[in-house]
Each structure stands twice: as C-alpha cells, then as structure tokens.
C-alpha cells in the first residue's frame, strides 16, 4: 500500500512538473501582447469592454475600437495593411527629419540645409535642389516634374505590391511580414522574438505617425525644425511652448 501511495504521489508530482514545464515554454510575448489576457487600453466610450471581434490575434490590438472600424474582417485586414505601411514610412520619415538636424547641431556635420522642410523648399530656389548635396546625382529644378516622377515610380511599386507581385515571385512569403530575403539578419527566426518585434514595430510606428504630424505643425507654426524647437523650449520653457506659439500664430504671416 505504501508503495502504491508513493507511486501515485510521484505520478502526481510528475504531472504537475510537466504542466509547469509546458507553462514555462509559453512565449512571454504570446501572453503579454496577444490573446484574451493581453494588456488592453479601453479608451473613451468603450464602456469598459472589448469588442468580441478584437481577440488579440494581431499585434497592436489593445481592445479599443469605439467607432467599430474593425468590425468587418475584410475592412480590418485592409486597415491593418494601411496602418503598417504608413507606420513604416513614418518611422523612416521621422528618422530622416531628425538625423540631419541633430548631426548639424551636435556633431558639426555640414549639410546644405539640415532642416527637413527647408531642404525640400530649395527646389524653388534659382539653383534648384541637389540630392544629398551633390549636383551630379539628381539636380531637381521643377516641383511638377519631381511630383510626376514620384507619383509614377511609387504608384507602380505600390500597384505591384497591392496586386501580389508577379506570379511565382516570393509566393511563400507573407505580404506584411515577408521575412526570408527581407530579413538578412535573421531577427525573426525565433517565433517569440518575432511576435514581440511585430508589436514593437506597430507601437513605435504609431508614435512616429503622431511625431511626423507634430513636426508638420511645428514647421507651420514656428518655422523651425523639431530639434531647434526642443532646444528653444529647454532653454526657456515659459516662453517657448506650444500654447505661446499657438496664440501668436497667424496663418500666412
């Protein structure tokens, strides 16, 4: 009898250990960022509840959709694609806006014009706009021609992507997260790491989209780049602040 009890106890212990081992192997990202137990942000008018169609299957789903924009699965899929593409463009744009101004102010790197909107405005100057400051690369003098080329080249690339590319070209890759040759560093090889990186990408992409909007507004209101605006604010926060700039702003002046 004692031996039977000992064997039963050992079996129960093994079952508990096996269950704990299985729980330990559940990816952290799967619990923290996905599924019903994920972190949620229930914003205004959410009635403290998550819509049933937001199951936590996709990265960046925090359970808030007051307007019901994601209720239709096809619309949801389209919005996911649009958001991710714009997020990636915003990440690149924010980097391109900040880097030249930072390098110019704090590293002494010489640019023809480090402020992002002033650099683009050089196309209206008599000398035109030289890409990367080098006239031998692209010397643009017509805004209409530049826009036309941009629309044609980017339109063709976007149409090619939206239509799934050519037949047989990278058919086995995901359209939003292709990986493979597009991940030469192998950052997405580990499933748990990949799941977490997708969440980080969309979170930072959303921040970048808001940042770019802020950069545009700053450029219109203050006529300065974001780095200079931050420098001015830190030097005198009571004078150089958003409220003061907004109250002094006159469109067209």
Curated annotation (Swiss-Prot):
<keyword id="KW-0793">Thylakoid</keyword>
<keyword id="KW-0460">Magnesium</keyword>
<feature type="transmembrane region" description="Helical">
    <location>
        <begin position="89"/>
        <end position="109"/>
    </location>
</feature>
<comment type="function">
    <text>The light-harvesting complex (LHC) functions as a light receptor, it captures and delivers excitation energy to photosystems with which it is closely associated.</text>
</comment>
<comment type="similarity">
    <text>Belongs to the light-harvesting chlorophyll a/b-binding (LHC) protein family.</text>
</comment>
<feature type="binding site">
    <location>
        <position position="242"/>
    </location>
    <ligand>
        <name>chlorophyll a 6</name>
    </ligand>
</feature>
<keyword id="KW-0597">Phosphoprotein</keyword>
<feature type="binding site" description="axial binding residue">
    <location>
        <position position="233"/>
    </location>
    <ligand>
        <name>chlorophyll a 6</name>
    </ligand>
</feature>
<feature type="binding site">
    <location>
        <position position="249"/>
    </location>
    <ligand>
        <name>chlorophyll b 5</name>
    </ligand>
</feature>
<dbReference type="GO" id="GO:0009523">
    <property type="term" value="C:photosystem II"/>
</dbReference>
<keyword id="KW-0602">Photosynthesis</keyword>
<dbReference type="GO" id="GO:0009765">
    <property type="term" value="P:photosynthesis, light harvesting"/>
</dbReference>
<feature type="binding site">
    <location>
        <position position="200"/>
    </location>
    <ligand>
        <name>chlorophyll a 5</name>
    </ligand>
</feature>
<feature type="binding site" description="axial binding residue">
    <location>
        <position position="158"/>
    </location>
    <ligand>
        <name>chlorophyll b 3</name>
    </ligand>
</feature>
<feature type="binding site">
    <location>
        <position position="150"/>
    </location>
    <ligand>
        <name>chlorophyll b 5</name>
    </ligand>
</feature>
<protein>
    <recommendedName>
        <fullName>Chlorophyll a-b binding protein of LHCII type I, chloroplastic</fullName>
    </recommendedName>
</protein>
<keyword id="KW-0604">Photosystem II</keyword>
<feature type="binding site">
    <location>
        <position position="206"/>
    </location>
    <ligand>
        <name>chlorophyll a 1</name>
    </ligand>
</feature>
<feature type="binding site">
    <location>
        <position position="142"/>
    </location>
    <ligand>
        <name>chlorophyll b 3</name>
    </ligand>
</feature>
<feature type="binding site">
    <location>
        <position position="70"/>
    </location>
    <ligand>
        <name>chlorophyll a 1</name>
    </ligand>
</feature>
<dbReference type="Pfam" id="PF00504">
    <property type="entry name" value="Chloroa_b-bind"/>
</dbReference>
<feature type="binding site" description="axial binding residue">
    <location>
        <position position="218"/>
    </location>
    <ligand>
        <name>chlorophyll a 5</name>
    </ligand>
</feature>
<feature type="binding site">
    <location>
        <position position="150"/>
    </location>
    <ligand>
        <name>chlorophyll b 4</name>
    </ligand>
</feature>
<feature type="binding site" description="axial binding residue">
    <location>
        <position position="201"/>
    </location>
    <ligand>
        <name>chlorophyll a 3</name>
    </ligand>
</feature>
<feature type="binding site">
    <location>
        <position position="132"/>
    </location>
    <ligand>
        <name>chlorophyll a 3</name>
    </ligand>
</feature>
<feature type="binding site" description="axial binding residue">
    <location>
        <position position="138"/>
    </location>
    <ligand>
        <name>chlorophyll b 2</name>
    </ligand>
</feature>
<keyword id="KW-1133">Transmembrane helix</keyword>
<keyword id="KW-0150">Chloroplast</keyword>
<feature type="binding site" description="axial binding residue">
    <location>
        <position position="41"/>
    </location>
    <ligand>
        <name>chlorophyll b 1</name>
    </ligand>
</feature>
<dbReference type="GO" id="GO:0009522">
    <property type="term" value="C:photosystem I"/>
</dbReference>
<comment type="subunit">
    <text>The LHC complex consists of chlorophyll a-b binding proteins.</text>
</comment>
<keyword id="KW-0934">Plastid</keyword>
<feature type="binding site" description="axial binding residue">
    <location>
        <position position="86"/>
    </location>
    <ligand>
        <name>chlorophyll a 2</name>
    </ligand>
</feature>
<feature type="binding site" description="axial binding residue">
    <location>
        <position position="204"/>
    </location>
    <ligand>
        <name>chlorophyll a 4</name>
    </ligand>
</feature>
<keyword id="KW-0472">Membrane</keyword>
<keyword id="KW-0479">Metal-binding</keyword>
<feature type="transit peptide" description="Chloroplast">
    <location>
        <begin position="1"/>
        <end position="30"/>
    </location>
</feature>
<keyword id="KW-0603">Photosystem I</keyword>
<feature type="binding site" description="axial binding residue">
    <location>
        <position position="83"/>
    </location>
    <ligand>
        <name>chlorophyll a 1</name>
    </ligand>
</feature>
<keyword id="KW-0812">Transmembrane</keyword>
<feature type="binding site">
    <location>
        <position position="64"/>
    </location>
    <ligand>
        <name>chlorophyll a 1</name>
    </ligand>
</feature>
<dbReference type="GO" id="GO:0016168">
    <property type="term" value="F:chlorophyll binding"/>
</dbReference>
């Amino acid at each position: 009898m004692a031996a039977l009890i000992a064997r039963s106890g050992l079996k129960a212990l093994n079952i508990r250990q096996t269950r704990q081992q299985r729980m330990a192997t559940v990816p952290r990202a799967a619990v923290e960022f996905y599924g019903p137990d994920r972190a949620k942000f229930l914003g205004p008018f959410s009635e403290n509840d998550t819509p049933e169609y937001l199951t936590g299957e996709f990265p960046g789903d925090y359970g808030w959709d007051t307007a019901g924009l994601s209720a239709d699965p096809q619309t949801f899929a389209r919005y996911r694609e649009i958001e991710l593409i714009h997020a990636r463009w915003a990440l690149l744009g924010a980097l391109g806006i900040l880097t030249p101004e930072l390098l110019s102010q704090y590293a002494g790197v010489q640019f023809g014009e480090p402020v992002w909107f002033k650099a683009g405005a050089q196309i209206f100057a008599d000398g035109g706009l030289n890409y990367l400051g080098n006239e031998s690369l692209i010397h643009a003098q017509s805004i209409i021609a530049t826009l036309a080329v941009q629309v044609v080249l980017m339109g063709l690339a976007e149409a090619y992507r939206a239509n799934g590319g050519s037949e047989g070209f990278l058919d086995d890759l995901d359209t939003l997260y292709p990986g493979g040759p597009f991940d030469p560093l192998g950052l997405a090889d580990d499933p748990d790491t990949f799941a977490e990186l997708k969440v980080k990408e969309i979170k930072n992409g959303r921040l970048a989209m808001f940042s770019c909007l802020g950069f545009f507004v700053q450029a219109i209101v203050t006529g300065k780049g974001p780095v200079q605006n931050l420098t001015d604010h830190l030097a005198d926060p009571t004078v150089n602040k958003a409220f003061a700039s907004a109250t002094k702003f006159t469109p067209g002046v």
